[in-house]
Regions:
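Short, surface-exposed secondary-structure edge patches
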Residues: 45-49, 62-67, 90, 96, ...
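PP2C/PPM family metal-dependent serine/threonine protein phosphatase catalytic domain
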Residues: 108-126
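Mid-length scaffold segments of soluble, non-membrane domains
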Residues: 86-111
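Solvent-exposed loop/turn segments at secondary-structure junctions
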Residues: 62-64, 80-82, 99, 106-107, ...
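Beta-strand-rich cores of mature extracytoplasmic or soluble domains
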Residues: 132-182
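Protein maturation boundaries and topogenic segments
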Residues: 1-84, 160-182
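Structural motif
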Residues: 54, 69-73, 97, 138, ...
């Protein structure tokens, strides 16, 4: 009997393709697991930054290695309610800070908050009409559309605990004309 000669070039090519496919699958899985949460913005509370129906990607990994910072746009479940839709708001104050809304403006630790976007004067200060001190795991959040937002000023949302934060909104995938980093 004759032994069939195996063409080593073909074997190497098959192995190379197999390794490339496996690496691609691992990268894709990692991306989807840590960063790939896609959600829709519901309502006008983040207008002009984000509009109702915008599709965004959420980085679920970043807050496992760092903490939210002022002006980060976060995605969270109100009061940890898993049956609720995701809320998208801007972080105004972080644990240990004090917050006060007075004469339509936001003060953090006695200083006027440095707004990164144009916002209207706040008509309803809610819970922040008196100085609030945030606990070790609490964040004060507001929508960019200050007078049309259900946020930390109201008892049904209140301060957001870190455990309720899903991640950081970082990329808009839809609509195409606004495609890009947030």
């Amino acid at each position: 009997r004759r032994k069939k000669k195996v063409n080593m070039t073909i074997v190497k090519e098959i192995l190379s393709w197999t390794v490339e496919i496996l690496v691609t699958l691992v990268i894709a899985f990692t991306f989807v697991y840590f960063i790939g949460l896609r959600t829709s913005v519901v309502g006008q509370s983040m207008s002009e930054t984000l509009e109702s129906g915008d599709e965004i990607l959420v980085n679920r990994f970043i807050y496992k290695v760092s903490d939210p910072k002022p002006n980060d746009i976060i995605v969270f479940l109100p009061n940890g309610n898993e049956k609720s839709h995701y809320y998208v708001k801007r972080v105004i104050a972080v644990p240990g800070d004090t917050v006060l809304i007075q004469n339509g403006a936001v003060y953090v630790n006695g200083e006027l908050f440095d707004e990164k976007v144009d916002v209207s004067a706040i008509e309803e200060a809610g819970l922040a009409s008196e100085e609030l001190k945030l606990e070790d795991d609490e964040y004060f959040v507001l929508g960019d559309n200050r007078n049309n937002s259900e946020d930390s000023r109201y008892a049904n949302i209140g301060n957001v605990k870190k455990d309720y934060i899903i991640g950081k909104a970082w990329f808009r995938v839809s609509p195409w004309k606004k495609f890009g980093f947030i």
